[in-house]
């Protein structure tokens, strides 16, 4: 049966060619953020929102909930900014939370550049993708969680261990906090 109907082309979000992934030279130069998904024991899906500083690969925060819309992302970023300061740029993929006008307006008001990777090219956000793999293998796949509170508690405990005790080979076999100490003045 040939109906000769026109095939409607998909709308594509075209972005200019991104810059190659550079190694930041100081803290708060570029942050990366991404989402991960998993399930509780009862089968309900939850999401984790991960934010790292690309300079020392420090995990700045892991937010866990069943739904993490753009206002929740902004609230999590504001909490991180309170103690860490503003980044110059944040690298992220093209998820609906990231391309929302709410997040774009927030970033513009704070003077933060949102760097979007090309669709289907997660290697352009390699720092946080590698971090996600570590999150997945070090604790997310190791336990079965009954509640969101259990997941958030485990995430907070693991984040401290990751930043303070776990050596990172990408930054010379030292922990993210040791890398941070090499550039931050020590209070006397």
Q: Where are the regions that the model predicts?
A:
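Charged DNA-binding/catalytic regions of mobile-element recombinases
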Residues: 1-188
């Amino acid at each position: 049966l040939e109906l000769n109907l026109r095939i409607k082309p998909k709308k594509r979000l075209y972005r200019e060619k991104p810059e190659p992934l550079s190694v930041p030279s100081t803290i708060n130069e570029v942050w990366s953020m991404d989402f991960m998904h998993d399930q509780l024991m009862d089968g309900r899906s939850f999401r984790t929102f991960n934010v790292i500083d690309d300079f020392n690969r420090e995990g700045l925060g892991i937010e866990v909930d069943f739904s993490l819309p753009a206002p929740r992302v902004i609230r999590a970023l504001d909490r991180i900014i309170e103690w860490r300061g503003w980044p110059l740029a944040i690298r992220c993929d093209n998820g609906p939370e990231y391309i929302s006008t709410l997040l774009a307006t927030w970033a513009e008001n704070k003077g933060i550049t949102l760097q979007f990777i090309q669709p289907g090219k997660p290697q352009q956000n390699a720092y946080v993708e590698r971090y996600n793999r570590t999150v997945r293998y070090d604790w997310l796949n190791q336990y079965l969680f009954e509640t969101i509170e259990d997941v958030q508690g485990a995430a907070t405990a693991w984040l401290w261990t990751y930043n303070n005790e776990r050596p990172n080979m990408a930054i010379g076999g030292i922990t993210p906090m040791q890398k941070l100490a090499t550039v931050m003045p020590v209070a006397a």
